[in-house]
């Protein structure tokens, strides 16, 4: 018997626990030529479950791509809930809008186009109630900046999740020349030093390889 790979396990788990509910977005993203850097289906479902577990009604996402993770989060906030998502590339944002409207959750999602460090001040200015959950999956070198913004836009008990922190183990390599790995180390150091955050990092393995995400609670 051939030993199953991590990708095989992902396929089994998708078939058993997730199904094709949000799969059309992945297909549309591929057809539009978007880079295949969406979260995996098990990771998308995890985001959905985490948001539901804290009763999140207001979510901020930094890094939309084609809206796959956005759809999972929009399903979680329910009717009357809001996801504000920030995307640098106008074409990606347009694909995301089509995907979200097709999925029937477009009315829950506010897509802001532009560099996140430019649009975050606008989000802060427009802010009514603070966000219950922030999901960060954008340019890694700005993760510490994004977390600092997230702290301004959340409340005690809010959750901040940052994707792609482990980088195939490179986050533990002090000598790594990979700027994304160094960004991961900078993030871990910030999470350790910031008194208003209680955080951990969970390693993941699957069809997306070896990586991991930071999970922090605002205290």
Placement of each model-derived feature along the sequence:
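A short alpha-helical cap/connector motif
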Residues: 1-135, 140-161, 165-219
């Amino acid at each position: 018997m051939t030993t199953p790979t991590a990708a095989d396990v992902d396929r089994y788990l998708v078939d058993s626990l997730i199904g094709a509910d949000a799969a059309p977005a992945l297909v549309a993203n591929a057809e539009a030529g978007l880079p295949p850097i969406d979260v995996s289906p098990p990771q998308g479902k995890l985001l959905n479950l985490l948001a539901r577990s804290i009763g999140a009604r207001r979510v901020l996402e930094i890094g939309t791509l084609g809206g796959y993770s956005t759809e999972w989060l929009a399903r979680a906030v329910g009717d009357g809930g809001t996801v504000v998502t920030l995307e640098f590339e106008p074409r990606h944002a347009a694909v995301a809008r089509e995907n979200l409207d097709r999925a029937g959750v477009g009315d829950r999602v506010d897509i802001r186009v532009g560099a996140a460090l430019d649009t975050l001040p606008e989000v802060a200015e427009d802010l009514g109630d603070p966000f219950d959950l922030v999901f960060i999956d954008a340019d890694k070198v700005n993760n510490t900046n994004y977390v600092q913004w997230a702290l301004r836009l959340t409340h005690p008990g809010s959750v901040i999740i940052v994707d792609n922190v482990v980088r195939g183990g490179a986050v533990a390599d002090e000598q790594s020349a990979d700027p994304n790995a160094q960004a991961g180390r900078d993030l871990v150091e910030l999470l350790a030093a910031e008194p208003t955050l209680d955080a951990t990092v969970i390693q993941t393995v699957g069809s997306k390889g070896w990586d991991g995400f930071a999970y922090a609670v605002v205290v």
